Amino acid sequence: MLDDKNFLKNIELNWDNEEKAKNFLYNLLKCRVLFDKYILKREFIKDCKENGKWSLQRLEAYQDEKNGKSLKPKYIGTFSGDDNNKKLRTLQACLRITYTSPKTMHWISLVLKNLIYDENNDLLKILEDYCVKKVKESNYEQASGFAFERIVFTYLDYILYRDGYSYKGKSIISK
């Protein structure tokens, strides 16, 4: 992965011959495509122009019948509207509001690292495992007051969304 502190060293290491340079550029472009396709972003359109809404979209080509059947780009949902897509969007939103600084968005590097080798990796499992690890590392058992890390609360929100919640036989949060 690229590290801004060592960017010039990385460039130097990856440009000392033509094959390395081509491979570096290919992987850089591949990471960009994977980022665009699998990482949640804010979309400012229609009714959401002011605050935006979370979206997970990929670029697809379509034939423009009007202009000589040339290919044109359009964005469509990365996944179908299934339950896993909603869970993945919700979990990524949890991580986006927990880790707001680029210096703390390590989960994005984790996703790209896993996808660059196999795009069929289970992103939901990868991110849920990451969150569980971060919650355990937060020392939440000993924390009180403002010492609780934000991930404890945002991941709990996600779990309640994912699994639902009932109290005394009454559904409070449904799946």
Annotate each PLM feature.
Residues 1-175:
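Flexible coil/loop and intrinsically disordered segments
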